[in-house]
């Protein structure tokens, strides 16, 4: 099952020693059977995710997901991630989306279906282990469901990241991400890692079969969807603002060239404003040099709550 490519770069991944019985989907280490993460820990944290979905629909979705996973594994394994070598007839919308995400995010595949474990109770296979352009380790899970359950996949990948670092003592996971692949739609979502304390509580509850345990995501439900919408809007707005500035510069140059002060059109008026100098009041300097005067002419006002957002470049 495990497909590792140690020839890409100088990152070498360790063998966990876990044996996977693919026909029965069971994991073994030294004769002891280990539990899969999704069927135990994720199920305990999110027990009712698929309760209202008919089994036939779940089976069809699982089959579709297996096909997508297999095509990605073949692309990275047999064809070494070279899209020029991949057979034209085997391309799918999902695979094209996948390749686009890999290129956009500067990723290279180190291993597919890479098995990690805590060497005691659990084992699972990570869909893809990647290195980014800086050599940082990125763990990726592929999802093909109609709805992306951000909180669930964030927990799943956080557990994988912990086990990955246990198997590979000298390596640290830089980030975890989900590739959502659904027809010609695709989305690359970088997720936050769940803290070790929360993972400890979940594992303890599962091992003790604690029926009173209830998982509470550190990042509440619905946040990631809003985050992604905000990021996409910000990128679109940023691109439009750049285009708008470029067009304004061209209009300004055209008006200069024609010595025009103003154009009035059906859309509005365009007025050339010549360069000038201005003055700005330095309130910080006044506060430093004459604090009594500054206090005399300032007044307090109520400022409404706001949100400060700093996106990664």
Give the positions of each predicted feature.
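Short, flexible loop/turn elements at secondary-structure junctions
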Residues: 114-116, 130-132, 144-146, 180, ...
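Short glycine/serine/proline-enriched coil/turn segments at secondary-structure junctions
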Residues: 118-122, 149, 168
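Short, mixed charged/polar active-site loops
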Residues: 121-123, 137, 186-188
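Short, conserved glycine- and acidic-residue-centered signature motifs
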Residues: 153-156
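Metal-dependent nuclease catalytic regions and adjoining charged, substrate-binding loops involved
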Residues: 151, 162-253, 259
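Conserved catalytic cores of phosphodiester-cleaving nucleases, focusing on short active-site segments
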Residues: 68-69, 124-146, 160, 233
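Extended, charge-rich alpha-helical segments
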Residues: 98, 232, 238-313
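Metal-dependent nuclease catalytic cores that hydrolyze phosphodiester bonds in DNA/RNA
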Residues: 1-123, 249
């Amino acid at each position: 099952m495990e497909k590792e490519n140690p020839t890409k770069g100088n990152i070498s991944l360790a063998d966990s020693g876990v044996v996977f019985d693919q026909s029965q989907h069971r994991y073994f280490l030294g004769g002891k059977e280990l539990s899969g993460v999704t069927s135990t820990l994720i199920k305990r944290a999110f027990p009712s995710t698929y309760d209202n979905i008919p089994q036939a629909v779940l089976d069809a979705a699982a089959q579709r997901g297996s096909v997508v996973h297999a095509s990605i594994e073949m692309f990275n394994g047999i064809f070494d991630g070279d899209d020029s070598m991949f057979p034209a007839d085997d391309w799918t919308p999902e695979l094209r989306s996948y390749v686009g995400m890999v290129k956009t995010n500067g990723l290279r595949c180190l291993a597919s279906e890479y098995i990690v474990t805590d060497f005691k109770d659990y084992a699972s296979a990570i869909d893809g282990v990647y290195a980014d352009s800086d050599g940082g380790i990125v763990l990726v899970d592929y999802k093909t469901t109609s709805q992306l359950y951000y909180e669930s996949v964030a927990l799943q990948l956080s557990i994988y990241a912990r086990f990955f670092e246990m198997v590979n003592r000298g390596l640290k996971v830089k980030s975890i991400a989900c590739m959502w692949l659904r027809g010609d739609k695709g989305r690359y979502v970088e997720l936050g890692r769940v803290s070790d304390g929360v993972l400890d509580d979940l594992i303890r509850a599962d091992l003790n079969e604690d029926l009173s345990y209830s998982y509470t995501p550190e990042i509440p439900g619905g946040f990631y969807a809003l985050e992604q919408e905000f990021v996409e809007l910000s990128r679109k707005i940023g691109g439009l603002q750049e285009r708008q500035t470029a067009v304004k510069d061209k209009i300004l140059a055209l008006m200069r060239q024609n010595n025009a002060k103003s154009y009035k059109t059906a859309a509005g008026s365009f007025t050339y404003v010549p360069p000038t100098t201005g003055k700005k009041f330095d309130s910080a300097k006044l506060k430093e040099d004459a604090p009594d005067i500054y206090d005399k002419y300032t007044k307090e006002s109520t400022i409404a709550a706001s949100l400060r957002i700093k996106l990664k470049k």
